[in-house]
Every structure is written in C-alpha cells, then in structure tokens.
Amino acid sequence: MSDIPKEPVSRQVDVGGDQSEVITVLSDPSSYSPPVPNVERIETHGALVFLAGDYAYKLKREVKLPYLDFSTIAKRESVCRHEIERNQEVALDLYICARPIVRLPTGELAIGGTGEPIDWVVVMNRFDQADLFDNLAQQGRLPVELMAPLAEQIATYHERAQPYRALDGNEVLAKVVTQTIMSFFEAGDPLELSQVHEYAGRIVAELNTQSQLLRARSQHGYLRLCHGDLHLRNIVLRNGQPILFDAIEFDDNLAKIDVLYDFAFLLMDLWHRDLTTHANHCFNTYVSKAVPTEGLNGLAALPAFLAIRAAIRAMVTIDKVSIVDENRQCEARKDIADYFSLAHQVLQAEEPVLIAIGGFSGTGKTTLAAALC
C-alpha cells in the first residue's frame, strides 16, 4: 500500500466561489415556469437541492474537495450531464435533464433559456422525502419485506454493469484506504490520532491478507462500474418499489469497484442503524441471486469492505460538519464517532457458528432458519 502519513497535515479544501446570485434565483418561487407556491432547500456537502412544484433542481456546490472537484462552470456542466447518464438506467422516471442557469441580455438570471450559462442544475422529478429509505429507517417504517426486491434490483444492476478485468482490485481499494486515512489525519478533530492509527494498522493488515483474493476477483470480472454510493439516502420507495438513484457521477474511477464492495455500503448503513434483520435479509437474497458458488470465497473480504465503507461515511460526515448549523454539528459528530466505531467493530474476527435445525414437515424450519441466518 501507499505510504500513510504519521502526523496530521494541513487539509486542502477549497470552499469555492460565490454562487449567491444563482442560489437567490433558485430560491425564488417566481423564477420557475409556472411559478410555484414555495421552494424548499436541502443541503449536502456537494450540492444544494431546490424542491419547486413537481420538480427538484440540484445545484453542484462550487467546491474542491480531496475526492471531487466542482470548482469551475465547465466541470459542473460536465458532472451534471454525467449524472443523467449514470442514473437513467435504474431511475429513468426520476432524472430529466441538465439545464443551464443563464444570464439574459437584460442582466437577469433565468433557469434555462437563451443566454450565457453561468451555472448548471440537474432537473429531476420530485418525490416525497418521506419515501427515502433513510427517512423510513429513522422513523421505524422501513419494511423488512422490501429488502428482497431491493437486493434483487442491486443484483440485476451489478449483472448488467461493465466489468474492468484489467484493473487490480487490491490496488483500487488500497488507494481508497490511503486517501481516507490521509483525510482523517488532515481533519484532526473530531477524531483522536490514536484512533486513526489503530484503524490504519488494522485495515492495511486486512487488505494485505486479502490482496490475492481481491486481484483474483477483478480478473474474474467482479470489479465493475457500480453505483458507488449505495446507502439508504440514495434509495427511494416509488410506486411500491425501491429505486436506486444518485450514483457517483463526479469520478467513474470511484465507482469501478468490486460488486461486493458496492453492496457493502448498504449493509453497513443498515447495520449502523441497528437494522440487522434487514441487513440479513438483504444479504441472503443478494448472495442467492448474484454470488455464484465459485464467488463465495469473496465473502472473506466483506469485513474489510464494511470497514472501509464505514470509514468513508465518517470522512464525508467530517466534511459536512463545516457547512451545517451548530445543532446539526453535534449530531454529525456523533455520527462520525459511530461510523468509526463500526469500522473497528467489523474488523474484529469472530468464530463461525453452525446451527442445525430439525423438525417435522411444516413446523417452520425454513422460516426459523431464514430469521437466524
């Protein structure tokens, strides 16, 4: 693996330029055609989403982070267009187009039309925020029965995804781990350096143990162009079915990953929320649909995949701390600690357990086995 710094270094994050004029226009109900009664705004570390009428308008923040660069108009246009391409296969009825924010000859800004583009937005069909799996989970309303169709959809997504056999699966993950650990060192607070050192040592050791397996999996076609950001905030219940959206659009290399590593993000998120029964149902369905017998040995890398995903979520939440209000900062800091704790937890080896279930026909052996596994 690449060398990992032993001490913190300055964090190179460009918080970007002034998009206030564009934000003002997108926040104004009269800017839309036809005008809307009101506009709601949702903020993430990389975008601002404006909910207006039946549509949502996603504005990329003018930022440059270690893992994404939206610092110019040209880059934001490119990434908006690519977001449409990346998501239309699985979320065709959500994504509409990339649209410019233009300066009219009068000097005013408009959403679309003829004029000089000064920014870009992704236009989507709006959905009820209550139907996000993230919100359903927080409110205790996420049915475990949705885990099977969700896992089947992910299995189909992975089956259709383009493989990249020439890539080295071990090198791909090693780069992710190195970047994540460097980001932790650069961030300093809210993580103790001793915690970062401990995680770094354990995950590097685990990757070294699984290096041959990871290389073999990429050679056998398990490394593909995946979703890349497969957690509960990027799944919505629409017409009674789970829909994946918001696949990584700013760097395809971050999405060219092992299919099990892609799937691990969802498992980690369910585990993080104490939805272990949901995780088990999702895992078992996915394995039965998408993992052939010869691919079962890949499950040996699952602890590393889960740990890396938890660490990445902690890293992204660290970046979010600086852009939220004080009340939400406390919540974000707790999330960071919880994610980092989970990253340590899943790397702890546990002894396997074999359970045999017996009984007469029709007494519920299969139901009990499904609940236990």
Each model region followed by its residue ranges:
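Glycine-rich phosphate-binding loop of ATP-dependent small-molecule kinases
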Residues: 286, 323-373
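Short regulatory "switch" loops immediately downstream of catalytic or recognition motifs
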Residues: 1, 101-107, 320-324
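Cysteine-rich, disulfide-bonded extracellular modules and peptides in secreted proteins
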Residues: 2-27
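Extended, well-ordered alpha-helical segments in internal regulatory regions
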Residues: 310-322
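Generic helix-packing signal
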Residues: 84-87, 184, 318, 347, ...
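Conserved ATP-binding subdomain of kinase catalytic cores across diverse folds
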Residues: 20-227, 232-312
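Hydrophobic alpha-helical scaffolding
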Residues: 12, 253-256, 272, 297, ...
